[in-house]
Amino acid sequence: VTDVDASKCMVAWARENAQASSLADRPCRWIVDDCAKFVQREIRRGSRYDAVIMDPPSYGRGPNGEIWKLEDNVYDLITLTEQVLSDKPLFFAINSYTEGLSPAVMEYVLKTTLCPKVGGHTSCDEIGLPVTATGGVVPCGATAVWEE
């Protein structure tokens, strides 16, 4: 497992979650870095991964003030990252909490980028928070998955 996040706090939190889940002794690399730059280096190194779980931010600023928006970059991020998938990948999942980026759009990007190269199928859904008092669910995001 390789956990990559540009936020030192998020990486620390992920490490704490692994420890709380009794997974601290499992092999995991904890990397604080820009995910796209990390993937570009992994491509040059020839690294390959069997699975990807992506939870990119909706919005961010680079060190030089560059503005990054997921809805403008989701296709490029997925096409970059699919280059590090192994020859027989297991799955590729992406979550988003970005208004205006629907589950169907994310599924379409996975379907048009991954399926022609490695086959498989895609699915998508909304992410929701359960409301105990009413038994309802408040939509708060989207998820899309490609599987072999």
Language-model-derived ranges and their functions:
Residues R15, I43-R44, N64-I67, V105-E107:
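Short amphipathic alpha-helical segments
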Residues L85-D87:
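Helix-to-beta-strand junctions that scaffold the AdoMet/dcAdoMet cofactor pocket
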Residues V1-D5:
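Conserved SAM-binding motif I beta-strand of class I
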Residues P89-E148:
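C-terminal catalytic and target-recognition region of SAM-dependent MTase-like enzymes
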Residues D34-A36, S58, T98:
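Active-site-proximal loop/turn and secondary-structure-junction residues that shape catalytic pockets
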Residues M10, V32, D50-L80:
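Mobile active-site "lid"/loop adjacent to the S-adenosyl-L-methionine
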Residues S7-A51:
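S-adenosyl-L-methionine
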